Each structure stands twice: as C-alpha cells, then as structure tokens.
Amino acid sequence: MLTAVPDPFYQKNEINIAKYTGYLTDTLTLSAMYGESTLHKRQINPSILPGVPLLGGVTNQNPAITGGTPITNNQSGAVGINAKDKSKGMRVDLEWVLGRHTLTAGIDNIKFEAFNEGQDQLVDRWIYGRTTGNIVPGHVGSPASPSNPNGYYAYKLIFKTATSMSLDQKAYYLEDRWQITDNFLLSLGIRNDKFTNKNNVGEAYLDAKNQWAPRIGFSWDVNGDASMKVFGNAGRYFLALPNNVAIRGASASTFTREYFTYTGIAPDGTPTGLTPVPRTDGGSGPYSSNGEYGTPVDVKAFAPSDLKNMYQDEFILGMEKMLTPNLMLGAKLTHRSLKAAVDDFCDPYALMDAAGLTPVDFQNGKFIATNSGGNRMEVAFCYMFNPGGSNTYSFANVDASNNPTGTRTDIKISSAQLGFDQGVKRTYVALDLYLDRPWDGKWEARIDYTFSKSRGNTEGQVKSEFGQTNISKTQDWDAAALMRYSYGYLANDRRHQLKMRGSYAITDEWLVSGNVRIVSGAPISCLGYFNPGNIDENDPAADPVGYGSSYHTCFGQIATPGSQRTPWTKTIDLGLVYRPAYFDKKLAVGLNVRNLTNDRKVTQVDVTSETAPYTVDNNYLRPIALQPPRTVQFSVTYDW
C-alpha cells in the first residue's frame, strides 16, 4: 500500500550511451553501441486524505437515509503510482566491402524491465447505485426487497494492478547492398527476431523464436546523374508484445466489485449496516467480470504456446525527379497489410463451449470444467490469442477436490470456433506527393500532400477511438459480439493531409519559419447495446458479455465505423530565430507561435451512445478533445 511522500509528483530519467567504431581494414568496419536508461516515476496526489473513501454515484444514495441531500466528503483520489523502468540495449555491426557488394551482419538486443508498474489503491472506493433488476445479469442478483423496494445498493471497488515484468528482444540480421551497375542498387536482407516476455516472478508467458523477416529494396538512378530516381522496398516487420501486457494479464491483479444493500451512511459517506446482494452464478463475495481476484496467474494458460507476435508486410514504390537544379518533385505509393495481431479474449463460456467443456464449479477466479471423459480442469476468464487464427490453449488439470494434479490438457481452437466471423484486418494505402526546395543558404520550402485510407477491424495495439490504451489488451476481440460489424475506417484514418513548411533568412542573423497543416476529419464510431434491429435491448442477448454500450450497433441499426467524421482542422505555426554574429552565432534567441489562429476544432468525440437499454447517453458525440490552443514559446540556447 502506497502512502503519502514528500515529493508526490516525481520523474527522473538517466541515460548513458557508449559507441565504438573501428576501421579494422580498408574494407572491414566494426561498430558497436551500448546504452542504458532508467526512468523513475512517482504520481501520488498529495491531496488524497488517508482513511477517507472515494465516493461515486452519491446522487443514488437512499433519500430515506440522507433526507435528499447526498452525504459526501472532500476525497480527491484513490490511486497512486511509484514505478521504475530500466532498459539496456546493445547493437553490433560488422561491415565488409567486397567489390560491388557491401555485406553487413549484426545483432540488435534490448532488455526492458519494469518494477512496480501499474497503480495501487490508497483508500477504499464506494459507489452507490439503484436498480430493481439484477445488478449484473447472470452473476449478481437484485438488491430490491420488501425492506428496500427501490433497490438502493452500494458496491466496494478494489482496483490494484502494480506489478513487475520484463521483455527481452534479440535479433540478428544479414544485409547485402549490391551495386549491380553504376546506377542500380539492390538491397537484400533477412532479420530474425526473438521476443521473450516474463511476468513478475520471472515466468515466460511468451517466447517467440525464429521470426524471419525478409527485406528487399532497390534504388535506380535513371539517368545516371541523380536527376531522376526510382526506388522501392518490400519487407516484413515484427512487433513484440509490450511489457504492460503483464499488468492485469500475466501477473496477478485485483479488479472486483462487492455489492451490498445498506441501512445507514457514515458521516464520511461509507455505507453501514451492510448485507451482501446474493450472487446468481453460485459464487459469493466480490465479483470480477474478468476474474481478477488477485490470485496467481497460470502463465501457460494465459498465452498459448503457439502464439504469434504482431507483424505486417509493407510495400513502397516511389520516384523523385529534379524539375530544376533546386526543385524536386516526388511521389510515393505505400501499402501496409496487417498479417497477425495479439489481443486478449475474455469470453470463458465461448471458450469452454468450443473446447467441449462443461463448467461445474468456480474457484479462485477460475471455472472448473469437465470434458466428455469427466476430466476436470481450470479455465480462466481471459487468454491472449491471435484473432483470426488458431491457438493451442493449455488447461491445468485438477482432481475431484479442485487441487492441481501437475498435468495439463492442450486443446487447439480456432477463432471461428470462438464465434468470430472474421479474422484480423487492417490495410493502409497512401499516395504521397511532394515538392521540395532544399536550403540554399537563403531559403527552403516543402509541400506534402497525402491521400490515404486506413480500413479494417483492428487499429493495432490500442483503441484510440475512445482512448483505451491497454496495449494488446483492448476491448476489441474480448468476445465475438464486440467485433460484429466492426469493419470500417479506423481511428487513424485521414483521407487528406496537406503540409507546407518553409524558412527564410531575412538577414545573416534573422531567420523566420512557418508550418501549415490542413487535415481532413477523423472517423467517428458509435457504440451501443447489441441491437442490429431485431433484438430487445432489455434482453440479455443485447449485452451477451456484460460490456454495456460497447457494440457496433446504435439505435437499432448497424453502426459502421467511420460513417461520420470530425471536422477538418487547420494549424499554422510561425517561428523567429535571432543568432547575433557577436556571439559567433552560438547564441540563439527564439520565438515560436503554435496554432497562430487559435483554431479549436473538435478532434475526438464521445462514441458511447447509451447508458442503459434505450437510454441515450447525454455525453454521446460530446467533444472530448480539441486542437491545442495557441501557445507562445520563448527560448534561449547557447552552443559550445
């Protein structure tokens, strides 16, 4: 448990880098680089009052107890962070020039470690509510009774995620830059990546080996005088599962709600005279929708042994043409296609059904299920998996008393068996056009225009349409119903982007610069209860996994992502730098104005359409992000 500290908001970063280059012979060069970084970060609100609960939903307190005036307090927060991140990296390259070939071999290793990452809870949290129906259908019953006909209740929320973890990234690669002719260069390469993720006790939950990434590229000096160049490349790129997957995943965490009716409220807002609301799923005590009860995680079950890391293929073809000695025209086509993704799946009932298992008990946040042969095994709430692929899930066997036997049962299950009607999809296509006038000692300018489309059902490792940053553990793919009708334009899709920048030396000491960026709007999604037009939203079928207003249907219709857009935005920045000759131009005094016109267009809106079945959320389409306001920055630098 964290406590108040003298310096509640603290961040310190230490970086050390060493580099070596050795020219062993005229044709053999060895280069090596080693670096370390340590980041200390502490965020503990000093205004948090020890021993005083953080309250929520106080307007739902029973007026028969409060007299119609909510009982509250001055508590301002409940959680804190006190973490340290460390990374060590080493890269070694050996380059050998052999005739028209430049051969390079190397290693690229990085180790990331995080200590006490996540957040801890400092005080109790109590949230008040009211309903005459079941609080959590299928799990927690109704608080209503003859003595509480209006269904007033309160629940105690516990949310603790602080843990430690590590990630090892190791790679080796080979490259041949082959100057086939004087004006044609061919690059051939291959890279092998190995990623190992470990939880707080050092257990590896993902150990991905032999991830081969081929690369090929070329550059053609068409006329042999650098007046026109055609270039292209194709390659595969792997992305490691990030460290924070261990938070609320491979490491133990607690996220529970314990529901009570009450007969009184203390002066600090804590409910008193508590009676537990009955569970309807056979359990008792706190309820966690994802099974986060603070119990140890079975890492062999958490991540399938054949889990593949996220990777995509990229293809680029472009050309550059010198229109004049000082003006270049360029064009580039880009195509990226996501081939595999990693996310969490949190529908244990669908998993058990696909595996031919029947739940018979519930213990320590896990289901106990039997197969057709009567064998008993543990089934957790959430598992990492490859959406659209097949994975081998490993279940720990238990005896008749639910004690582990030390053996496991492996079952291969496809995404289709889990109910998904589509695999992972993400394609990005773009055409870039640009005019570049390089700096000649007096002025320079560049204009870029990009036409692009980003479509699919998976943005990547985050879900930015409503700010979900749980990397590789987003709401997407938690259950099949959440992904129905999800294909559309992704949150990072911008159809048109125009960027202009330039600088001009007014005198030998004064330089003025400017940037203009005009961007078309971002896609707007709509999330509601699951009702494509033929489902009663009061029916459990409208919220099959208990996520509330989180499905791609709104107001009885399918809501294709990107059917609406935020407005276009325009940003103008200006800069002025003075370098007096008196100081040999080592002194620079700068003035920068960002967003000169102070445009405040909406860049993101709330996409949740309902707070309850057939109840429109008053915050739906409310702006939650605007362009940053105009700022003026004054700076002084000195180079020596």
Give residue spans per PLM region:
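Structural signature of Gram-negative outer-membrane beta-barrels, strongest in the C-terminal barrel
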Residues: 21, 27, 33-35, 84-87, ...
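Repeated loop/turn-to-beta-strand initiation elements of outer-membrane beta-barrel proteins
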Residues: 27-30, 101-103, 183-186, 226-228, ...
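C-terminal beta-signal and adjacent terminal beta-strands/loops
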Residues: 326, 339, 346, 453-455, ...
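Transmembrane beta-barrel strands of outer-membrane/channel proteins
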Residues: 32-36, 105-111, 188-192, 232-236, ...
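Gram-negative outer-membrane beta-barrel transporters
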Residues: 181, 185, 326, 332-526, ...
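Solvent-exposed loop/turn elements at secondary-structure boundaries
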Residues: 200, 206-209, 213, 217-419, ...
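Hydrophobic, lipid-facing positions within transmembrane beta-strands of outer-membrane proteins
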Residues: 12-18, 34, 86-92, 107, ...
